[in-house]
């Protein structure tokens, strides 16, 4: 899908390919490991293989089932990644002799529980952009400063939608009972892609509204957006690039309870201070809906499917952003941290202001 971007610069030309040399990910765990307990915790570096391939490889080596190995999240295949896995410590001695050319065990410790999906705070990234000229490097500098100050939209990345980008199409058919999928994991993957697609469409629409708010007068906007003048004036006065609308569902950041935004001044301040953020809908049962004007926009991207829904941060705040231009190599290197569930490729696309695949 074509989408709106949050930054105002023109698109930046550079080369990016997701390879282990140019794309490095390091997992940041949810908690410190205590150093004792029946679970062996391995910090593993891998390149060119997915998390599930790593798990299958180790399970086969140990003669155990894949489900006996714990991990917090799925890491990219086309990258150099460092992540934690857990298994019973009775396998420690055999793992001491485990060898693979694309896998290295960097360290080990112990803990009193198995690592499970979601047991991570986020990920640290190192990324290299190539064929960058000095003018583009300056534009990248400014884009990173803007993201460091205000944050960025939390789109689902292209990886969510499969190699052909069409997983959401099958997901919609399955969710509506028009197509069958016997494998429960594949079924859930495809339906999630459909939910993610609707979320991305909604987020792009909100960014389009932001752009219109910034570039047109209130008198021009009222008939264009069908939003009352007093609400448009409130949106115009907001300093943040993502304009909050009455009825938005907010969430304490980086985690916490949901609550409804009713336009109170201290909530604008908390959003600017990165203490709260706005959420978008992942359609389905049990999901909290926005209200009022916000719901008028959201309902066009909702679908009453018989699956559990949720809210997802629509706007996130990357941390520890650092960029360096290497003139002689025409390369730009950047480091940053993203909370779990966020895509580094989305940040790169925000900088480029275009698709990168």
Swiss-Prot record:
GO MF entry, a single one: RNA binding
Annotated ranges, domain TRUD: 151-331
EC number(s) reported in the record: 5.4.99.27
Catalytic activity: uridine(13) in tRNA = pseudouridine(13) in tRNA
GO terms classed as biological process: tRNA pseudouridine synthesis
Described purpose of this protein according to its UniProt entry: Responsible for synthesis of pseudouridine from uracil-13 in transfer RNAs.
Stored Pfam families: TruD (PF01142)
InterPro entries hit by this protein: PsdUridine_synth_cat_dom_sf (IPR020103), PsdUridine_synth_TruD (IPR001656), PsdUridine_synth_TruD_insert (IPR011760), TruD_catalytic (IPR042214), TruD_pseudoU_synthase (IPR050170)
UniProt enzyme class: isomerase
Keyword set, alphabetical order: Isomerase, tRNA processing
Organism expressing this protein natively: Sulfurimonas denitrificans (strain ATCC 33889 / DSM 1251) (Thiomicrospira denitrificans (strain ATCC 33889 / DSM 1251))
CDD domains: PseudoU_synth_EcTruD
Family annotation (HAMAP family): TruD
Top-level taxon of origin: Bacteria
Name of the molecule in the record: tRNA pseudouridine synthase D
